[in-house]
Amino acid sequence: QMPELPEVEIVKQSLSKKIEQKKIKKVIIKNRNLRFKIPIKFEKLLQNKTIKKVTRFSKYLILNFDDDSFCLIHLGMSGTIHLIKKNTLNRFTNTSFYKSPELPKKHNHVEIQFEDINVIYNDPRRFGFFKFIKNKQALIKRFSHLGPEPFSRSFNLKYLLNYFVNKKKDIKMNKVLKYSLIGI
């Protein structure tokens, strides 16, 4: 089932503790065929970048690089992130939300290597994706169709009342709901 907003927040917090202020040494793509095909140049775009901060908007994880470019990560329906310390010979994995005694052997599609840790993206269904975003303007444009972040000041009773005024459809049937109330 699809990771919920709180799970994505926990993954963000776990990544923040482990990879912020660290330089990407190497990116290995084992399967480019995710929801959106990972371009051939993706590895080169990320290699040698330093992660300034890990953030989240809706269910998107955002790696903020020191050159003001970004990498969006969406876990899709079944994606998980595994954090592997390099000196453990892959015998232990901390997946930041789930605990597992060993690294899954199948469906590891993306590996981001740092000096002391590897970040592995595992996704049996391949509905997740990675996307390089070149600058802040492109990132803002990417999210412009979405509503406010649920924990922001702009997501309040006034916003909800304005959103639901004159809506005739059942809440569950409202197709734009996922864009107006992000994280659902």
Language model segments and positions:
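Extended, highly charged segments
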Residues: 2-71, 75, 84-87, 91-94, ...
